[in-house]
């Protein structure tokens, strides 16, 4: 099991991860209530959230998340084709619908589980006003989504982007265009167009490679 520590909005989070389970450990003082029954709504069942169970004592609160088999990570996606990276970016935008739920969340890569088909599921979620993050709205979601998307295509980590680098770093033109957009729908539209373009290019390249291999095999067969 590996330990991952991150800080978001001034609060430290400790993730303990293995292939089948994630744990998030918080200090009891990080939860601004003595009524732990209020946290039961975090055990919600939703296709965009990992299944969760919870335990606590006088000092700590522990959340356990069940993982699907053969999950991926961001490093794996970054090594894949541009179209697959764009597909992940689009799937992150789909999490916008979770804003309608009575919980909050954040889009740090360590808090998002990527399934084998690149769907994205949220691990840690919070009760509004008594946990971090206290709230999340469309504007905040858009900012975090942009940070995640740029983290896919560059070496800039989510945290530094979120803390201010998002607005000042140099990025390729298509990412700069994404950065300037003012709504999730505009970002989705731009990414979708780029995704279709890259799929066509990659499909054409694959066809050329297959034809070249066939010709090579054909000529080799003649000389054998």
Short names for language-model regions:
Residues 216-224:
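Membrane-anchoring helices that localize proteins to membranes
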Residues 107:
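Hydrophobic HxD+1 residue recognition
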Residues 110-112:
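Hydrophobic residue at the +6 position relative to the catalytic HRD Asp in the kinase catalytic loop
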Residues 6, 101-103, 115-217:
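C-lobe/activation-segment region of protein kinase-like
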Residues 10-87:
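Conserved structural core of kinase catalytic domains
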Residues 86-94:
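Short, hydrophobic/amphipathic alpha-helical packing segments
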Residues 93-102:
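Protein kinase catalytic-loop region centered on the HRD/HxD motif
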